[in-house]
Amino acid sequence: MRGQLKVLKKTPLIFAVPTTAGTGSETTLAAVISNPDTHEKNAINDPVLRPKFAVLDPELTVGLPPHITSTTGMDALTHAVEAFIGRSNVKSTEEAALKATKLIFQNIEKVYEDSKNIEARENMLVASFYAGVAFTRAYVGYVHAIAHNLGGMYGIPHGLANAVILPYIL
């Protein structure tokens, strides 16, 4: 299953509580489904998947190891960059993408070096949220297309694949 408007049944009220600062899932209408048998990762986009409420609690991210913190942060950065340069962006998505990018650059090293820095962790969650808002309207691009294939085929973590590919696509 992949594509637009694929949810055929009524969904329950969705609340999102992210435990990493990267996917932006708490504000998007996208879901990614991995099939380990076929080594595919497919995206579904449907407005019914967008959470109605989100709680951004930085305490839930404190125990993350540095490599998860950095790669999920790079996922958020990639969302913001791809939304900013995408063809479907508008002024509001550009603003959200810029806010996300600024927050990520100001905080990603801080949380990598000090996992208990609550203020930096909160800022990374907010950045991920803004990036999610931006790419929900403007979509992602080539970086994610390649990263999804690498993740599906070879099990490479999504944020790591984004981090490696982003400079080459830019």
Enumerate the predicted regions with their spans.
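Short, flexible, glycine/charge-rich loop motifs used to bind or transfer phosphoryl groups or to couple energy/partner
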Residues: 3-5, 43-44, 144
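Beta-strand segments within the central parallel beta-sheet cores of soluble alpha/beta enzyme folds
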Residues: 1, 14, 121-123, 163-165
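Proline-centered helix-kink/hinge sites
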Residues: 12-13, 18, 51, 58, ...
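Active-site pre-Tyr helix/loop in NAD(P)-dependent dehydrogenases
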Residues: 20, 80, 169
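Proline/glycine-rich low-complexity loops and linkers
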Residues: 1-30
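Carboxylate- and glycine-rich phosphate/diphosphate-binding segment that chelates Mg2+/Mn2+
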Residues: 27-138
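C-terminal catalytic subdomain
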Residues: 138-170
